[in-house]
Amino acid sequence: MIQFDNVTKKYPLGNYALNDVSFSIEKQDFVFFVGPSGAGKTTILKLLLKQIKPTSGSIFVNNKDITSKKFHDTLKLRRSFGVIFQDFKILFDRNTFENIALALEIENMQKKKIKEEVEEALITVGLSDKKLVFPVQLSAGELQRVAIARAIVGGRDIILGDEPTGNLDPKTSWDIMKIFKKLENDKTILIATHNVDVVNSFKKRVITLQNGKIIKDQQKG
């Protein structure tokens, strides 16, 4: 489903964000990318979203080479990903329901279908009782649940999380990760994190990066 073949990302000053990285991820895999700041975790997610281009190597998503000059479906590609960043944007003049619905309104989905999708996502993330509440009244953990709900609506089958528990306390981090666990039977999940405690709580595949290289690829459990 996702494949990196000898991917390198080198910046003009000569430093490597990724250096000859190769791995493959199958449908409905749950994979953690771990390592210190600057190891290359976020670079992998940005390459998948085509926010940046690799210096060399190939990246395949659903058997399509997204690094090829012949690839022109960037918008469609991005819509296949549900993305959760640590500093995700939220509109403070819209309530919880409206913030989640925004992702579908952009795609001109029918209002009835939007309501169904958002209601289901609210149940999944445990925010049904907060759907009319505005962001200023939500905790940090609840705001992150809004971000997850926004990522899973619309049938997106690949979830990318960049430090999704980075600013949360241990208990809230655990609660957030339990939501991802509920999604694993339907989604392919890739999470970049330096939170080793969270990673060790899950018996999942862990790809460890250091200085732009994979130093360990381990299936736990």
Model-derived features: positions:
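Helix-to-loop junction immediately C-terminal to a conserved catalytic motif
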Residues: 49
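Catalytic Walker B motif of ABC-type/P-loop ATPase nucleotide-binding domains
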Residues: 159-162
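Conserved signature/switch motifs of ABC ATPase nucleotide-binding domains
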Residues: 133-136, 154-155, 185
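Conserved ABC ATPase signature
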Residues: 134-144
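ABC ATPase NBD coupling module
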Residues: 66-82, 183-184
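Conserved ABC transporter NBD signature motif
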Residues: 57-65
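A short, flexible loop at the N-terminus of ABC-type nucleotide-binding domains that lies
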Residues: 1-4, 9-20, 70
